[in-house]
Amino acid sequence: MAKLKITLVKSLIGRPESQRVTVRTLGLTRTNSSVIKEDTPQIRGMINKVAHLLKVEEA
């Protein structure tokens, strides 16, 4: 299965709590932090929910 590199590029300050929880669940803690995750439907759903805050690329 493919892997995705997910980077938080925008701050969570002033964002709704649901978006903050989603970003934390992805494992991102601060701006410019990155994680590598498997490309699953569950991860894609979380990415779509906060896509405006993230940069996603193939790992």
Swiss-Prot record:
Keyword Ribonucleoprotein in annotation: yes
Keywords: Ribonucleoprotein, Ribosomal protein
One family name in Pfam for this protein: Ribosomal_L30
Organism domain of life: Bacteria
Keyword Ribonucleoprotein: yes
Gene Ontology terms, MF aspect: structural constituent of ribosome
GO cellular component: cytosolic large ribosomal subunit
GO biological process: translation
Subunit structure: Part of the 50S ribosomal subunit.
Family designation: Belongs to the universal ribosomal protein uL30 family.
Protein name, per record: Large ribosomal subunit protein uL30
